[in-house]
From Swiss-Prot:
InterPro entries: Cyt_trans-like (IPR004821), NadD/NMNAT (IPR005248), Rossmann-like_a/b/a_fold (IPR014729). Catalyzes the reversible adenylation of nicotinate mononucleotide (NaMN) to nicotinic acid adenine dinucleotide (NaAD). It holds the Pfam family CTP_transf_like. GO terms for molecular function: ATP binding; nicotinate-nucleotide adenylyltransferase activity. SUPFAM superfamilies: Nucleotidylyl transferase (SSF52374). This is Probable nicotinate-nucleotide adenylyltransferase. The gene is nadD. It comes from the Bacteria.
């Protein structure tokens, strides 16, 4: 079985995340795709604004109708800083005979050498990096044993930071965020300034 993983803060989840996941799923003919929300991303300190429970619930609401995708709470249960190596070790134990692919944006390639235990990580999973057609990534990754696969993607210029700012300014999230996640954000009053 071929299983893909897409990690991130998902604060909030948006169509850029989901289209990237779908592109990798289709191009690499994955059997499953697991979204892995981080408790705290190591290279983005203090970037998360909503609770782990809210981010998990938003993500589940966004993909619950799509049987190709599932959401794991492994990093949220672990808490603290979320290192990909810890999740890769966990998933390798869960799926010892399967092909595992960690999906990243091409913008992460120049930072990959900074990831914790990246050499071991390269033994546990292959990496799929998303690249926008016509905009090749010029970064050179020189990590022995690392298996990289390019995915031509429909990368969207959407950032969760921008979306949180839109909520603060009373602007719509329509066409940026899945409807069920928008409903959740509204019901929970997420990303609003404190009263």
């Amino acid at each position: 079985m071929k299983i893909g993983f897409l990690g991130g803060s998902f604060d909030p989840v948006h169509f850029g995340h989901l289209i990237a996941a779908q592109d990798a799923f289709e191009q690499f003919r994955l059997d499953r795709l697991i979204l892995v929300p981080a408790a705290q991303a190591p290279l983005k300190p203090n970037d998360v604004q909503s609770s782990p429970e809210d981010r998990f619930a938003m993500l589940r609401a966004a993909v619950e109708w799509d049987q190709r995708f599932e959401v794991s709470d492994v990093e949220l249960r672990r808490g603290g800083t979320s290192y990909t190596i810890d999740s890769a070790r966990y998933f390798r134990k869960q799926f010892p005979r399967d092909e595992l692919y960690w999906i990243i944006g091409g913008d992460q390639l120049p930072q990959l050498h900074l990831w914790r235990d990246v050499s071991e990580l390269g033994q546990l999973v292959d990496f799929i990096f998303l690249e926008r057609p016509g905009f090749p990534i010029k970064a050179r990754v020189d990590i022995p044993g690392l298996r990289l696969h390019r995915c031509d993607g429909h990368l969207l210029a959407i950032s969760s930071t921008e979306l949180r700012d839109r909520v603060k300014r009373n602007l719509s999230l329509d066409y940026f965020v899945p409807h069920k996640a928008i409903v959740y954000i509204r019901e929970k009053h997420l990303y609003r300034p404190s009263q």
